């Protein structure tokens, strides 16, 4: 298995698909990296030689990926929450941020329904 940016890339996949195993790299960026490195996207990872892998590592190194990207995202959300702005408050409450309705739906963000509390008399 090839190791790029601390991630094992599956051998049986094409280079374009294999690079998407790295957090922060999707299909488009993967294709751009392959073009910049001069590697065919249809080439299987197991067929890449050491020179190709080194070029790919160099190109991937130009982007913020994996732990650094996760850390940056977390810090951005934390900053919003510390500011107390609308988006930060919504993050804190675990509600949708972008104006979606919450009277119904929004189950993914709000979590499973709680049982209705019965009124005692």
UniProtKB/Swiss-Prot annotation:
GO biological process, one term: translation
InterPro entries: Rbsml_uS13_C, Ribosomal_uS13, Ribosomal_uS13-like_H2TH, Ribosomal_uS13_bac-type, Ribosomal_uS13_CS
Gene: rpsM
Subunit structure: Part of the 30S ribosomal subunit. Forms a loose heterodimer with protein S19. Forms two bridges to the 50S subunit in the 70S ribosome.
PROSITE patterns in alphabetical order: RIBOSOMAL_S13_1, RIBOSOMAL_S13_2
Keywords, sorted A to Z: Ribonucleoprotein, Ribosomal protein, RNA-binding, rRNA-binding, tRNA-binding
Superkingdom as given in the UniProt entry: Bacteria
Region (Disordered): 94-121
Similarity-based family: Belongs to the universal ribosomal protein uS13 family.
Annotated GO CC locations: cytosol; small ribosomal subunit
GO molecular function terms noted in the UniProt entry: rRNA binding; structural constituent of ribosome; tRNA binding
Protein name as annotated: Small ribosomal subunit protein uS13
Task performed by this protein: Located at the top of the head of the 30S subunit, it contacts several helices of the 16S rRNA. In the 70S ribosome it contacts the 23S rRNA (bridge B1a) and protein L5 of the 50S subunit (bridge B1b), connecting the 2 subunits; these bridges are implicated in subunit movement. Contacts the tRNAs in the A and P-sites.
């Amino acid at each position: 298995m090839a190791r790029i940016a601390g991630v094992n890339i599956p051998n049986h996949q094409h280079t374009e698909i294999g690079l998407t195993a790295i957090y922060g790299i999707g299909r488009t960026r993967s294709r751009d990296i392959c073009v910049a490195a001069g590697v065919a996207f249809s080439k299987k990872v197991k067929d890449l030689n050491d020179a190709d892998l080194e070029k790919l590592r160099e190109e991937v190194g130009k982007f913020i990926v994996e732990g650094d990207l996760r850390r940056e995202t977390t810090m951005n959300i934390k900053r919003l929450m510390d500011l107390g702005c609308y988006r930060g408050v919504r993050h804190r409450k675990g509600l949708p941020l972008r104006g979606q309705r919450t009277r119904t739906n929004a189950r993914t963000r709000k979590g499973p329904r709680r049982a209705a509390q019965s009124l005692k008399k």
